[in-house]
């Protein structure tokens, strides 16, 4: 049986933020959420997160993100070191299994690496995740009985307690380990805080394992990025770019054309058909699906959307919770809000906003317009400056526009109202009553021309 313990109690002072460190986001998800997502795929019977600073906020966020996962939380109050943190989880650990310990601020650990660490433990050994770093400053150093990696592993010395000779060692402990649970419990009970920091170090269990004759082995990740932690905004920004580059490369390998992979951000999942083109500085959030031949212009923000084959999204368009039909044209500078559903070959032009509305095939609103809570038929032409007045101060109401309706410029459609198929609305009208099919609706003051009128003259 496998129990997973995730360390997430730290304050993150260097983040200089009131937000708990593990709730800072990387590619749109909290750091801890990345770790829990990886852990959830390992088949553990229990995912135990150790919280401390901002515990209630952290626990609520993770319960919301993983409603079906076998989550458990224990609190470390006060924070007296990594060993003290794991001691808080002891009552929840199954003696007959293996305990895997991960870091809540090391978000890019791969499931394959975590699994390799558990396999290295094999229920009998203490397995440490180590890596060689060009600059090991701040990390605990691996001590071996000799200079080579194949030499026996004897222990770990924390950076603050290391001698100059020990600090020259490049192999470091990443903070992650796997151990037989029964042995781990025994070692945790023997921890001492007799060190420079007066803390209980989890790393001290290594020397205890050696003393007990338990083999101590090391596993290593495929890349350094997997074990990089976050302690400052600079480190978070570095990890963001590393992850975004990795995601961009995966899309490029799948055939997506990114104008510049260094200027691309994915904060969720992005599914793409063939021949998809994405220009620079686009941000994709939540779950986005792009059909075959979709083209996305520069500087677009697209969240939780489906865009069908052949659609073109022009630059500076914002799409949130919307569906765009095949061959549709959207933007530039358009906004599709939640509930917007555009049919095939619909045109939504510059500075047009659509919210909670459906537009059937071939409908057009090419500039400076608002459609909210509306049902729009096929081939409708919706003039510049026209809006649906859908809110009466208390409730929202719908506007129904039939097929082949022509709405002139600068019209106000006061909902609830229905325009029958083929109706025409004269420009500048405020329509508050239904217009029958095929009829002309005009509601504006009659034009007056005053003959002989002269402009006022400036006084001398």
Curated annotation (Swiss-Prot):
One of its GO terms (cellular component) is cytoplasm. UDP-N-acetyl-alpha-D-glucosamine binds at residues 21, 76, 81-82, 140, 158, 231, 337, 355, 370, 381. CDD domains: GT2_GlmU_N_bac, LbH_GlmU_C. GO terms for biological process: cell morphogenesis; cell wall organization; lipid A biosynthetic process; peptidoglycan biosynthetic process; regulation of cell shape; UDP-N-acetylglucosamine biosynthetic process. Residues 1-233 are annotated as: Pyrophosphorylase. The active site is at 367 (proton acceptor). Pathway: Nucleotide-sugar biosynthesis; UDP-N-acetyl-alpha-D-glucosamine biosynthesis; N-acetyl-alpha-D-glucosamine 1-phosphate from alpha-D-glucosamine 6-phosphate (route II): step 2/2; Nucleotide-sugar biosynthesis; UDP-N-acetyl-alpha-D-glucosamine biosynthesis; UDP-N-acetyl-alpha-D-glucosamine from N-acetyl-alpha-D-glucosamine 1-phosphate: step 1/1; Bacterial outer membrane biogenesis; LPS lipid A biosynthesis. Its cofactor is Mg(2+). Residues 234-254 are annotated as: Linker. Mg(2+) binds at residues 105, 231. It is an enzyme of class 2 (transferase). Residues 255-460 are annotated as: N-acetyltransferase. Its main location: cytoplasm. It catalyses: alpha-D-glucosamine 1-phosphate + acetyl-CoA = N-acetyl-alpha-D-glucosamine 1-phosphate + CoA + H(+); N-acetyl-alpha-D-glucosamine 1-phosphate + UTP + H(+) = UDP-N-acetyl-alpha-D-glucosamine + diphosphate. Binds 1 Mg(2+) ion per subunit. Keywords: Acyltransferase, Cell shape, Cell wall biogenesis/degradation, Cytoplasm, Magnesium, Metal-binding, Multifunctional enzyme, Nucleotidyltransferase, Peptidoglycan synthesis, Repeat, Transferase. It is found in: Cytoplasm. Its EC number is 2.7.7.23, 2.3.1.157. Transmembrane segments: none annotated. GO terms for molecular function: glucosamine-1-phosphate N-acetyltransferase activity; magnesium ion binding; UDP-N-acetylglucosamine diphosphorylase activity. The keyword Nucleotidyltransferase applies. Catalyzes the last two sequential reactions in the de novo biosynthetic pathway for UDP-N-acetylglucosamine (UDP-GlcNAc). The C-terminal domain catalyzes the transfer of acetyl group from acetyl coenzyme A to glucosamine-1-phosphate (GlcN-1-P) to produce N-acetylglucosamine-1-phosphate (GlcNAc-1-P), which is converted into UDP-GlcNAc by the transfer of uridine 5-monophosphate (from uridine 5-triphosphate), a reaction catalyzed by the N-terminal domain. PANTHER family: BIFUNCTIONAL PROTEIN GLMU, NUCLEOTIDYL TRANSFERASE. In the N-terminal section; belongs to the N-acetylglucosamine-1-phosphate uridyltransferase family. In the C-terminal section; belongs to the transferase hexapeptide repeat family. Homotrimer. This is Bifunctional protein GlmU.
